């Protein structure tokens, strides 16, 4: 039977939602593929039958740790949350800039250096990581109405010099054409090499730095900033050729080489690393196209983009595995040491798909594999973290890095929820909403029973009957009542993760790396820059959603 597109206007029955009222089921489209019977056939018993009112509902959530998230009539108690969000945003931005040199609070930090944390003992995080620094700078450029240009230029200057510095992996560029030394993840705050044993190389750093610097280049062009003669680059072309190009060369040369993951624990091939490498290459090709620059380097980049894309989506490489309906973060340890679930997969999706221009890249925010990864992280971590025990199934919870984590922020014992993981869940859902609203896209809900609709059936809707093994989809057309109420539900789910975080943040707004899974109190490295950055990311995309509604 050929593919059919069926519109059901004023379909028999009503769609009852958990907001104290019901609206007629109008402008809902069901795409059907090769069904033997129409879904309105009583004998089929599909999701929308003519046996009476449909019982598909939006899930309701009432209490979380004693805090009203929204009541049974859907009334959102947002005043306390809104007040806290505003205050926490202010604290987060202040703390981020305190952790960037030159800092009045930490004067030993060199200009342009972004420290991971001011903590120097138990644990010692008083270093600069290429990854953390790049993610922080990326957020500053993305979210600030007028980012501190001197901070950005100082960061570029640090990047320029680190690339040309020797480290334990090898000689810096300029001494050799080999880029292997760019895989060193960690440096001292005075820009000297960190020479102790560590998990090297980490191949995501150059990619993340490229992404951040390409965004700086765009800002400099748009703002007409005069670079002057203070630094070793006088134009955006210099910045690209002298910094970004070397990081891209590293990706071309080493993308298919093993390295340590972003948690610095496992040496192998990782979803996070590969997806951000793909993004860096893709954004660089956009740079060449926009600047109308030609280079033989471009064809190498195109081939690398093709190669990484193919590698990521090839089932043989294990990131997409028929056994699971979520993304496997590091396939080499799935099934043996871990489940493969990892918050880093959502971090990667959010980092890469922060704008519609990246929608052609795989694993976009609305990809069922991405959304189901969030669902499964919630499913696992709801039970392993006692502070989540009182949370309803359809509300946000405290999330950690991966279910098998044993790092407690000081040593090895029992893993805890992380601030950045919990904020990433919110960011993912806000991104999902923003994408559909800003681009006026319909909501597409998978209706097959191969578990690809787990996010929708377990977190958003109840009684969402599947349509068999064929690929059927429920389409909620943009700006219809069905669409709007579902978007509201997803927004409330996104907010509920921040409500959960709020319950464990002190009055001073300090964000450490983790919060204890039993007591809920902050622990691990204090004033973690990545924690503040992750909150800022969630806050900012939330504001963009509110402005677009």
Curated annotation (Swiss-Prot):
Q: Does the keyword Lyase apply?
A: no
Which EC number(s) does UniProt give? 3.2.1.3
**Catalytic residue positions:** 261, 264
Q: Which GO terms describe its molecular function?
A: glucan 1,4-alpha-glucosidase activity; hydrolase activity, hydrolyzing O-glycosyl compounds
Q: Where are the transmembrane segments?
A: none
Q: Which Pfam families match?
A: Glyco_hydro_15
Q: Specify which residues bind substrate according to the UniProt entry for this protein.
A: 198
* Gene Ontology CC: one annotated term: prospore membrane
Q: Which reaction does it catalyse?
A: Hydrolysis of terminal (1->4)-linked alpha-D-glucose residues successively from non-reducing ends of the chains with release of beta-D-glucose
Q: Which GO terms describe its biological process?
A: glycogen catabolic process; sporulation resulting in formation of a cellular spore
Alphabetic keyword roster: Carbohydrate metabolism, Glycosidase, Hydrolase, Polysaccharide degradation, Sporulation
Q: Which PROSITE patterns match?
A: GLUCOAMYLASE (PS00820)
Name the family the entry cites. Belongs to the glycosyl hydrolase 15 family.
Which protein, by its recorded name, is this? Glucoamylase, intracellular sporulation-specific
Which organism does this sequence originate in? Saccharomyces cerevisiae (strain ATCC 204508 / S288c) (Baker's yeast)
């Amino acid at each position: 039977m050929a593919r059919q597109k069926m519109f059901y206007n004023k379909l028999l029955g009503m769609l009852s939602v958990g907001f104290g009222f019901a609206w007629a089921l109008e402008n809902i489209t069901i795409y059907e593929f090769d069904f033997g019977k129409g879904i309105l056939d009583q004998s089929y018993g599909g999701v929308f039958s003519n046996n009476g009112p449909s019982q598909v509902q939006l899930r309701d959530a009432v209490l979380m740790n004693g805090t009203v998230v929204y009541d049974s009539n859907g009334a959102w108690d947002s005043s306390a949350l809104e007040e806290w969000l505003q205050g926490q945003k202010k604290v987060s931005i202040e703390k981020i800039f305190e952790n960037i040199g030159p800092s009045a609070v930490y004067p030993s930090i060199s200009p342009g250096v972004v420290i991971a944390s001011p903590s120097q003992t138990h644990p010692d995080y008083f270093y600069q990581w290429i990854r953390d620094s790049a993610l922080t700078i990326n957020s500053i450029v993305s979210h600030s109405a007028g980012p501190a240009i001197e901070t950005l230029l100082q960061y570029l200057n640090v990047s320029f010099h680190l690339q040309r510095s020797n480290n334990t992996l090898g000689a810096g560029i300029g001494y050799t054409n080999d880029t292997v030394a760019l895989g060193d993840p960690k440096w001292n705050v005075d820009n000297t090499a960190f020479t102790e044993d560590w998990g090297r190389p980490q191949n995501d750093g150059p990619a993340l730095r490229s992404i951040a610097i390409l965004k700086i280049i765009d800002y400099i062009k748009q703002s007409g900033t005069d670079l002057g003669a203070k630094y070793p680059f006088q134009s955006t072309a210099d910045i690209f050729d002298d910094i970004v190009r070397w990081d891209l060369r590293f990706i071309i040369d080493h993308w298919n080489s093993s390295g340590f993951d972003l948690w610095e624990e496992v040496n192998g091939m990782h979803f996070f690393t590969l997806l951000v490498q793909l993004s860096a290459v893709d954004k660089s090709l956009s740079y060449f196209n926009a600047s109308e620059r030609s280079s033989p380097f471009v064809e190498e980049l195109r081939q690398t983009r093709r190669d990484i894309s193919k590698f990521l989506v090839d089932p043989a490489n294990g990131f997409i595995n028929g056994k699971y309906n979520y993304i496997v973060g590091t396939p080499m340890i799935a099934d043996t040491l871990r489940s493969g679930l990892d918050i880093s997969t959502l971090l990667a999706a959010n980092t890469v798909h922060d704008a519609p221009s990246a929608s052609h890249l795989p694993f976009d925010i609305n990809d069922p594999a991405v959304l189901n990864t969030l669902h499964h992280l919630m499913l696992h971590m709801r039970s392993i973290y006692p502070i989540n025990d009182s949370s309803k199934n359809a509300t946000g919870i405290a999330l950690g890095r991966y279910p098998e984590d044993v790092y407690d922020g000081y040593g090895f014992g029992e893993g805890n929820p992380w601030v950045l993981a919990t904020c990433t869940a919110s960011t993912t859902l806000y991104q999902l909403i923003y994408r559909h609203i800003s681009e006026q896209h319909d909501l597409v809900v998978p209706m097959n029973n191969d578990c690809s609709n787990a996010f929708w059936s377990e977190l958003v809707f109840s009684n969402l009957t599947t349509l068999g093994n064929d690929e059927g989809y429920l389409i909620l057309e943009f700006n219809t009542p069905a669409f709007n109420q579902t978007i509201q539900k997803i927004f409330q789910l996104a907010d509920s993760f921040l409500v959960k975080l709020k319950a464990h943040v002190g009055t001073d707004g300090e964000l450490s790396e983790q919060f204890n899974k039993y007591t809920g109190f902050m622990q691990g490295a204090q004033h973690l820059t990545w924690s503040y950055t992750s909150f800022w990311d969630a806050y900012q995309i939330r504001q963009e959603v509110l402005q677009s509604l």
